[in-house]
Amino acid sequence: MHTRAIYPGTFDPITNGHVDLIERAAKLFKHVTIGIAANPSKQPRFTLEERVELVNRVTAHLDNVDVVGFSGLLVDFAKEQKASVLVRGLRAVSDFEYEFQLANMNRRLSPDLESVFLTPAEENSFISSTLVKEVALHGGDVSQFVHPEVAAALAAKLTSINT
């Protein structure tokens, strides 16, 4: 029985689509660790510490979820966390090929680590952190795509960058 899962990502920022998947994963597994990747190649707007804090605030209502920042190989992080399942989201068919390659690589590196794919609710299927940042950068209202605390943090971040 798989009791511990990891939902990895950059979460820059966490969106309603992410939260939807986290809430559903929390119903499927005894414990879910949200692994926030340092991933310097993505040049995130928020620091790792800021992303961990935002995700902690947005998921505080889930007793069986914790949030941990990490760097390095995901399979190593999964071993450290004693997780046997990776949860990944698929928004569209276009996500599948990349996720399929990742799942196969992770299986090769760690044969006991299973990948489970969840699809978001229809109203969240088009939301991505990249699109949210783009809308916010151009002054658009992102409140329907992210938690209010995330919207405020994003507005503050963009204000500090533009001043």
UniProtKB/Swiss-Prot annotation:
One of its GO terms (cellular component) is cytoplasm. Its EC number is 2.7.7.3. Pathway: Cofactor biosynthesis; coenzyme A biosynthesis; CoA from (R)-pantothenate: step 4/5. GO terms for biological process: coenzyme A biosynthetic process. The keyword Transferase applies. Gene3D superfamilies: HUPs. Substrate binds at T10, K42, L74, R88. The record marks H18 as: Transition state stabilizer. Keywords: ATP-binding, Coenzyme A biosynthesis, Cytoplasm, Magnesium, Nucleotide-binding, Nucleotidyltransferase, Transferase. Signal peptide: none annotated. It comes from the Bacteria. Its main location: cytoplasm. It is found in: Cytoplasm. It catalyses: (R)-4'-phosphopantetheine + ATP + H(+) = 3'-dephospho-CoA + diphosphate. One of its GO terms (molecular function) is ATP binding. Its cofactor is Mg(2+). Homohexamer. Reversibly transfers an adenylyl group from ATP to 4'-phosphopantetheine, yielding dephospho-CoA (dPCoA) and pyrophosphate. Belongs to the bacterial CoaD family. This is Phosphopantetheine adenylyltransferase.
